[in-house]
Amino acid sequence: MTKAIFPGSFDPITNGHAEVVEAAARMFEKLYVVIMTNTSKKYLFDEKERLDLAKKVFENDKNIEVIARPAELTVEVAHELNAGAIVRGLRNTTDFNYERDIAGINKTLDPKLNTVLLFTRPEDSFISSSMIKETVFFGGNVSTLVPKPVAAALEEKLRNQNNEEK
């Protein structure tokens, strides 16, 4: 069975992420969406919330499993799951340069583990989790940029934060 992992912080999952997951799920018999930690990011959703949201987004996909591995190296997660590939999504050349460097580190750690890069659609190439959070923070509507469960969770999170500030 060909297995792959799609690691990320997914704070929150965007339509671009979902698009890459769906494309990868057609390429591999089993795809693990792995909720991980990026130490350089400030999170809006905690690990459990990110895990639950991802599970909701992909609940109808039989060959996709969502798991959390917040304190492990990507290569170690791939080994643990017997995955032969790491899937990463690209929006632009900035992403390419970043992902090339990560793929190089991963290849150094495990020369047999490959990275598969998938491009998002041009209409999704500007979407980033950071921009989504910023837009929501200032009251913008992102419902066309994220899956429905994510849009609802963002609205609720914003409402709760606004209530706490009052």
Swiss-Prot record:
- Binding of substrate occurs at 9, 41, 74, 88
**Which UniProt keywords are listed?**
ATP-binding, Coenzyme A biosynthesis, Cytoplasm, Magnesium, Nucleotide-binding, Nucleotidyltransferase, Transferase
What pathway does the UniProt record associate with this protein?
Cofactor biosynthesis; coenzyme A biosynthesis; CoA from (R)-pantothenate: step 4/5
Catalytic reactions of this protein: (R)-4'-phosphopantetheine + ATP + H(+) = 3'-dephospho-CoA + diphosphate
Q: Where in the cell is it found?
A: Cytoplasm
**One GO CC annotation:** cytoplasm
- GO BP annotations listed: coenzyme A biosynthetic process
Q: Fetch the CDD domains from UniProt.
A: PPAT (cd02163)
Cofactor(s) listed: Mg(2+)
- Show which residues form the site (Transition state stabilizer): 17
Among Pfam families, the record links this protein to:
CTP_transf_like
Q: Which EC numbers characterise this protein's activity in its record?
A: 2.7.7.3
Where primarily located?
Answer: cytoplasm
InterPro entries in the record, alphabetically?
Cyt_trans-like (IPR004821), PPAT (IPR001980), Rossmann-like_a/b/a_fold (IPR014729)
Q: What residues bind ATP, as annotated? A: 9-10, 17, 89-91, 99, 124-130
Q: Name one GO molecular function term.
A: ATP binding
| Known role | Reversibly transfers an adenylyl group from ATP to 4'-phosphopantetheine, yielding dephospho-CoA (dPCoA) and pyrophosphate.
Q: Which family does it belong to?
A: Belongs to the bacterial CoaD family.
Q: How does it assemble?
A: Homohexamer.
HAMAP family in the record: PPAT_bact
Q: What is this protein called?
A: Phosphopantetheine adenylyltransferase
Organism of derivation: Lactobacillus gasseri (strain ATCC 33323 / DSM 20243 / BCRC 14619 / CIP 102991 / JCM 1131 / KCTC 3163 / NCIMB 11718 / NCTC 13722 / AM63)
Question: Highest lineage ranks of the organism?
Answer: Bacteria, Bacillati, Bacillota, Bacilli, Lactobacillales
Gene transcribed to yield this protein: coaD
